[in-house]
Amino acid sequence: MKFRLTVLIVFSLCLSNVFADEGMWLLGNLRKNKQTDRVMKELGLQMPVNKIYDPKKPCLADAVVSFGGFCSGVVVSEDGLVFTNHHCGFSSIQQHSSVEHDYLKDGFFARSLEEELPNPELYVRFLLRTEDVTKRVLSAARHAKTETERRVAVDSIMNVISMEVSEKDSTLTGIVDAYYAGNEFWLSVYRDYNDVRLVFAPPSSVGKFGWDTDNWMWPRQTGDFSVFRIYANTKNGPADYSPENVPYHPEYVAPISLDGYKEGSFCMTLGYPGSTERYLSSYGIEEMMNGINQAMIDVRGVKQTIWKREMDRRPDIRIKYASKYDESSNYWKNSIGTNKAIKHLKVLEKKRVAEAELRNWIQSHPEEREKLIRLFSSLELSYSNRRETNRALAYFGESFINGPELVQLALEILNFDFEAEEKLVITRMKKLLEKYDNLDLSIDKEVFAAMLKEYQSKVDKKFLPAMYEKIDTLYNGNIQTYVDSLYATSNITSPKGLKRFLERDTTYNLIEDPAVSLSLDLIVKYYEMNQSISEASEQIEEGERLFNAAMRRMYADRNFYPDANSTMRLSFGTVGGYTPFDGATYDYYTTVKGIFEKVKEHAGDIDFAVQPELLSLLSSGDFGRYANAQGDMNVCFISNNDITGGNSGSAMFNAKGELLGLAFDGNWEAMSSDIVFEPDLQRCIGVDVRYMLFIIEKYGKSAHLIQELKMGR
């Protein structure tokens, strides 16, 4: 009896929403979710939930955007200004940078609308409404006898429902997403704006202060923000870039608070979290640790060492490789922290105890036992059957698909539709040719050789693609000689060579190029490996769905939130510090004093290098209306809001729906947060909006932007 009680308690902690600050909540369910509404009000919320989200009236959610499909942002002016993170705008800033105009290093400040810089591939997405379409989707799959048949039926009806939206209104995009491991389905209707221009970017000494050293760490002093503007046609509708476009006028503008926060202040985030695996089985967690996470750690570590060495040597390479290095290293360090936290916080052990209780519940309920008696044995066997190959696939993807850029170019060429409409072919070819702008062949050759060696050292020889046999037979096993020959003989190592190559009479000549031929071999091997585990993968997909549904039935009175899936979510909690380990306590905010301390502590370290004029400005202490109650300048703060990747740039609002700052990171001690919420440790790191405005007005001398903003009362 004592054991069963202990197990039940642990299970509750692992799988149910028992913490007020846990959860990424669906906006469409807010009105019906009385428990969440009650808890938010108890924590201090001072606005009704229909002011947060209402598909029929302007509301707070109307100011929140998906930024490029990979980050979040918030609209803060009647003329379409958008605040997001510096690291979210980093790729756009990099694309506009050169050695002569180094906006990464020095920042960018548009003095007028005419100086704002277009970004052809960037868009923002507004959520208009959501709709539960579960019954319609599941009805279409009711006759499916296998997981494959179910998936085909579900995918088909999801596409039909999505297309119905754009058929009625070409300016809208409909997307049906799966929730609760495929047990529920919701339609989200969006409107996209494709003309988004760069307005303001602080220097990287502000926006990336601390760089890799401080990434995922607290305390933090990173001014992680950038400013863009949405443009529309003269009717305020979506339009591709045109000089004739005008600033977009939004449905709702987020007001800004200069009052700050204190310990215990209510705080909520609205944004687009990417993905979590809170309900994943222990078998899935173990596979994640030893598969994709470990592959990222090993392979990206090798690749990034080569990139960083050359970036530190040459300014042109630093600019070319800045964005891709930043993206790669972010997930690399995340994987390191996640695996470490899973072990340190005993996530697997807790999950297994929870699963033991679920087994007991199934055994004690005849109707459940009949359906799920083999659930755990099937999951365990299926994960075991694909373990070795799945691990090899993880290393394959990191080493080749995400490895040398010559291979990535070749794969794009193989997938290029030369028979498409001429205008589309020209546009896509232009994008393909632009990739050469950020490619250095000597670096890429070194990366390719390193990837070949790394992959070979990590997998069984049965997983080696055909090129390894070629290296052995034609190049005496010398990988470097093979790589040198490949780059010397391929036509696609330069834009001119690619153009000449593609001007031939037929696309069948494509495979004559050694790089394209190699990539075709890689596709064949990748397909072969995936096919060998397709049955196990189908059984896992079904098993995880049944596992998820069983958990929800077991705790039918609980309020379960679905895993993140890049749809808009609300999370809420309070501002507050935490105790990372015994004997240490971290405060809930940082100030500019911490910048000076780190600059001194890390003297000579480029991660903490700051322009003298910025240090002089900060040391003056003249913070004006942006100062805190003590006359100092807050830089960052933390709350126990529940966030993940994709939440970067999410608006952090106070109890009245006024902007306090932007979420930009999580903390190192709780890096397993995508799998399990740790209430005592997990924190959302945000940049204080007052620091952002100070940098915009005083350092960027852009008071005209401040005048556009709507300040809270």
Each predicted region: which residue ranges?
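Terminal presequence/propeptide segments associated with secretion/organelle targeting
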Residues: N17-R713
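Bacterial Sec-dependent N-terminal signal peptides
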Residues: M1-E22
